[in-house]
Amino acid sequence: MAGTSPASGVRAGAVFCSAATWWVLAARKGAALVFCPILPQSENHHRADIPVPWAEALRSGCPDGARIRCRPVLRPSTQGLIRRGQFSAALTERLLTTLCAELRHRQQEDAPAPRFSTRSPG
């Protein structure tokens, strides 16, 4: 059907891969799709990382030991991505909660520092 997004039937928690990266769909924002990258095992961890349980990795087809980096990446569609599976509702809910918390942390970090007035005694 013309004008229909190729992602119209896809819901949050859907797992995709591109040539180099695995992705999980977190939400829709207007006409755009919000994805979070799924990273392979490494020593570098971030506060916004969620480990993917082995059963979820097996069910969704993503690499064992992977983790979700709760960092929003906007894409206009799923074009160029291959759907691999679906995370459970529980993991998807945890993803959304962690993503919202990370966005709040970033807002606080990016906010201008409060100015304190210093008054000399006397």
Name each model-derived stretch.
Residues 1-10:
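Mixed-charge, Lys/Arg-rich low-complexity intrinsically disordered regions
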Residues 56-122:
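C-terminal terminal-subdomain/extension
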Residues 20-21, 68:
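Structural detector for hydrophobic anchor residues on beta-strands
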Residues 12, 18, 24-58:
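Compact nucleic-acid interaction/catalytic patches
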Residues 2, 30, 42-44, 60, ...:
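Short, functionally important structural connectors and interaction interfaces within domains
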